[in-house]
A protein has these predicted regions:
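Cleavable N-terminal export/targeting peptides
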Residues: 1-31, 239-240
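Detector for outer-membrane/organellar transmembrane beta-barrel domains
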Residues: 119-185
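Outer-membrane beta-barrel "beta-signal"
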Residues: 131, 192-200, 225-240
Length: 240
């Protein structure tokens, strides 16, 4: 498993590479394509399936082969900022186009937390790419629950330059949680994200909610930052 300092060393060694994007460095190694940066390079394997709270220091690498196989690691938090634990998401998969407009992708992600006792979890995902947009499904086995997710990333069609992504997840708890008036054994949550770059800044407007409310929110442990409806505006700018 790659350590964060090893990722940073690799990143430093590639600073002289041609810039493929403001936050991604890319280099060809024979039949392989290597990418490093502070922006996820695969939306299905990083960020879209199971987004995590991103810390001030984050980044990763992605190695893909002409055959369609790929492997990578993404760390949404390097554990440097106060209150942020080190997280390393390791993934592998296969991606292949049927033609110029349609393709498919399958893969597996492992979420691990080396510096804490939180058990690792796995996620199996698959989806279709149609005219640049992605539609998929994912199944994961967190230590306390099972999750089934439907997602869509409509980046292939951006009205007014705005990217749109949606996610809907059903969570089945391994052990029902006691709340006022009964128990919660399962719940659902969802989110809608609008994204647009503006003067070098990546802007995200996110609406999230769940089917829980009131005292039942004590049982919530889903993807969103809170149980009730929430609107979040996020702005991010690369340092290089």
């Amino acid at each position: 498993m790659f350590k964060p300092f090893y990722l940073l060393a690799l990143l430093g060694s590639l600073l002289a590479c041609p810039v493929a994007h403001a936050q991604i460095f890319q280099r060809e190694l024979g039949d392989f394509d290597l990418k490093l940066g502070t922006t996820p390079t695969r939306s299905m394997a990083q960020g879209l399936v199971k987004p995590s709270a991103v810390g001030s220091f984050h980044g990763g690498l992605d190695l893909s082969h002409d055959s369609g196989f790929y492997f990578g690691q993404w760390s949404p938090s390097a554990g440097i900022s106060p209150g942020k634990d080190l997280e390393i998401d390791t993934y592998a998969g296969f991606k292949q186009p049927f033609d110029q407009t349609l393709g498919y992708e399958v893969g597996l992600i492992r979420y691990s937390y080396p510096e804490v006792t939180t058990p690792a979890s796995q996620e199996l995902f698959g989806g279709l790419t149609l005219l640049g947009s992605r539609f998929g499904i994912a199944f994961s086995n967190d230590p306390d629950k099972q999750n089934s997710t439907l997602f869509a990333d409509l980046s292939g069609n951006q009205p007014f330059g705005v990217g749109i992504s949606l996610k809907y997840t059903t969570h089945q708890l391994n052990t029902p949680v006691s709340v006022d008036g009964g128990y919660v054994g399962s719940f659902t949550d969802w989110s809608l994200k609008l994204s647009r770059p503006f003067m070098g800044i990546d802007l995200d407007l996110i609406y999230s909610d769940s089917n829980l409310g009131g005292s039942s929110c004590s049982a919530y442990s889903g993807h969103n930052s809170q149980c009730d409806g929430l609107v979040t505006l996020k702005a991010e700018r690369a340092f290089y």
